[in-house]
Regions:
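Nucleotide 5′-phosphate-binding alpha/beta core
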Residues: 1-76, 82-99, 103-107, 188
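Active-site glycine/GP-rich loop and adjacent strand/helix microenvironment
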Residues: 1-17, 138-255
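Conserved AMP-binding loop of ANL adenylate-forming enzymes
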Residues: 106-140
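Short, flexible loop segments at the rims of nucleotide/cofactor-binding pockets, characterized by
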Residues: 93-94, 120, 141-145
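Short, conserved acidic/polar surface loops in the N-terminal third of protein domains
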Residues: 86-90, 110, 127-130, 155, ...
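Short glycine-enriched loops at secondary-structure junctions
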Residues: 71, 94, 121-123, 170-171
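Short acidic, glycine/Ser/Thr-rich loop/turn "cap" segments at secondary-structure junctions
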Residues: 82-89, 113-120, 156-157, 162
Length: 255
């Protein structure tokens, strides 16, 4: 594995903070595993894993690692396959998330001159509000449409001269098909498409790009770690770039 000295120090500080919390989910797991700190790669490899069920068992606020007075927001997984996972956010978490998402926009070539139409859902889901926070921090104009109402989406796309469209891949495909069907491609100014929450194969991506004439970007994220915006592909199309000063990614052999 590859991990820098700076990253080890960051992990060590966080681990020691969690161990000191008497009734905290992660602190308890670390103490049970005999962890006292992380000063080497060997120490890092000894950290215990957490699985989805572990996070569900912490419902509702067992994952909070700060006093409740410091929690400014919660988000939640859908809970369609079991108890939802609730993630508490501090003010700093919200700010850091916006910084990462703003980077995603910049990586995709979005500027403060752009008009960004945001169609992912809001509410407990992390998608819409994440797209909006990064957009506003960057300084672009957010058009917070939310999901559905395709007729209005297309009307705003034309009236507002939207230049960046954000959506799930399936909704982007629906919009692309409607633009073709209605023959309005010459009435829109889209230049970028950023999708998230769903995987899209090369065939679907090409279909969307051909119909809308846009550059296609795909973000990465998950509710348990900030939300969407912790990574994005670049214009060269060689996989995802993850913000390693915020998130350390390790690929684990399940065996």
């Amino acid at each position: 594995m590859q991990i820098t000295e700076t990253q080890l120090k960051q992990v060590d500080a966080q681990v020691k903070r969690l161990i000191a919390l008497p009734d905290h989910f992660y602190g308890k797991r670390l103490r049970e595993a005999g962890i006292t700190g992380v000063s080497s790669v060997e120490d890092f490899l000894a950290l215990p894993f957490c699985e989805k069920q572990d996070l569900r068992e912490a419902y509702p606020l067992g994952l909070a690692a700060v006093p409740e007075s410091e929690i400014v927001r919660i988000h939640s997984s859908s809970g369609t396959t079991g108890t939802p996972v609730i993630i508490p956010y501090t003010k700093k978490d919200v700010e850091d998330w916006a910084i990462q998402f703003a980077r995603c926009y910049e990586y995709a070539g979005v500027t403060p001159e752009d008009r960004v139409q945001i169609t992912p859902g809001y509410g407990l889901w992390t998608a819409g509000i994440g797209f909006q926070a990064g957009c506003e921090l960057l300084g672009a104009m957010a058009v917070p449409m939310g999901p559905g109402n395709t007729e209005k989406q297309l009307q705003f796309m034309m009236d507002m001269q939207t230049t960046v469209f954000t959506a799930t891949a399936s909704y982007a495909l629906l919009i692309a098909e409607e633009v073709e069907k209605r023959g309005i491609k010459d009435k829109i100014r889209l230049r970028k498409l950023i999708t998230g929450s769903e995987r899209a194969g090369e065939k679907i991506r090409k279909r969307i790009v051909d119909a809308l004439g846009v550059e296609y970007y795909d973000i990465y994220g998950l509710t348990e770690i900030y939300g969407p915006g912790i990574g994005i592909n670049c214009a060269h199309g060689h996989g995802m770039h993850v913000w390693s000063d915020y998130v350390y990614v390790e690929i684990i052999d399940p065996e």
